[in-house]
A protein has these predicted regions:
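N-terminal Rossmann NAD(P)H-binding glycine-rich loop of SDR-like oxidoreductase domains
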Residues: 13, 21
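Active-site helix of classical SDR
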Residues: 109, 145
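Residue(s) in the substrate-gating loop at a strand-loop-helix junction
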Residues: 129
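Rossmann-fold cofactor-recognition segment
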Residues: 45-58
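C-terminal helical subdomain
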Residues: 171, 186-222
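Conserved NAD(P)H cofactor-binding loop of Rossmann-fold oxidoreductase domains
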Residues: 77-85
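Short alpha-helical oligomerization interface
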Residues: 86-99
Length: 238
């Protein structure tokens, strides 16, 4: 008999995380969900629910409780993150972004890695962003923390391989997605629907893709970005 597959989605209260959790449940996964706003998780149909604030010191303990409620964990999916344009470099926005996307990300991904190392296998997938490709002046801390996330996942993948650990990694890099994260007066180009992005994410996870840029337009865009010299990039007005 095939073993039941168990996934935990952190940051499942809205947007991409919510859609991925729903899709996994529809596909027969045993799913545990977590977020700061647990009241938004009740109708999702998950097997287990836990309140987790990734910026809190007790977040790893809460993850452990969720794993116990679920009866194990085969995939850890990290969808928790914040981001704002901050052209005035407001200190509070910069530091809050680093706290969630930097410290919180490291805390949760690290705990999942240690759990899978003890277990002997596992799969870590996380939403990062195409914003980590280059330094984006309108959103300095967001861009910088996304680059950090890209490199952190790559570093852990290299470490796991060198240690002989059976841990897979999938770095999900969406373009602009129509979620609350990008709500406001500014109209972003080439917006993606979260439902479409979720399908692409679940496909990438099931095929054990190392990096998945979503979608083809953003794969083309980031390929061009990488080739722009620094002296040209700094003169581009975004």
């Amino acid at each position: 008999m095939q073993k039941e597959k168990r996934a935990i989605v952190v940051g499942a209260s809205s947007g991409i995380g919510f859609e991925v959790a729903k899709l996994l449940i529809e596909q027969g996964w045993i799913v545990g969900v977590a977020a700061r706003r647990v009241e938004l998780l009740q109708g999702i149909g998950a097997t287990a629910v836990e309140r987790i604030d990734v910026t809190s010191d007790d977040a790893t303990e809460a993850l452990g409780l969720l794993i116990k409620k679920l009866g194990g964990m085969d995939i850890y999916f990290h969808a928790s993150g914040i981001g704002k344009q901050n052209r005035d470099l407001t200190e509070g926005i910069e530091l809050a972004t680093v706290q969630t996307n930097g410290v919180g990300f490291t805390r949760m991904i690290g705990e999942a890695y240690r759990f899978f190392a003890r277990q002997g296998y596992g799969h870590i997938a996380a939403i990062t962003s195409i914003a980590g490709t280059k330094g984006l002046g309108p959103a300095p801390s967001y861009s910088a923390t996304k680059a950090m996330q890209n490199i952190y996942l790559q570093a852990l993948e290299q470490q796991a391989h060198s240690r002989g650990l059976n841990i897979s990694f999938t770095d999900i890099r969406p373009g602009f997605v129509d979620t609350a994260l990008l709500s406001g007066d500014f109209q972003y180009p080439m917006m993606l629907r979260p439902e479409k992005v979720a399908k692409d994410i679940v496909w990438a996870i099931s095929h054990h893709k190392h990096i998945r840029v979503i979608d083809w337009k953003y794969r083309l865009l980031t390929a061009v970005w990488r080739r722009i010299p620094r002296w040209i990039w700094r003169n581009i007005k975004l």
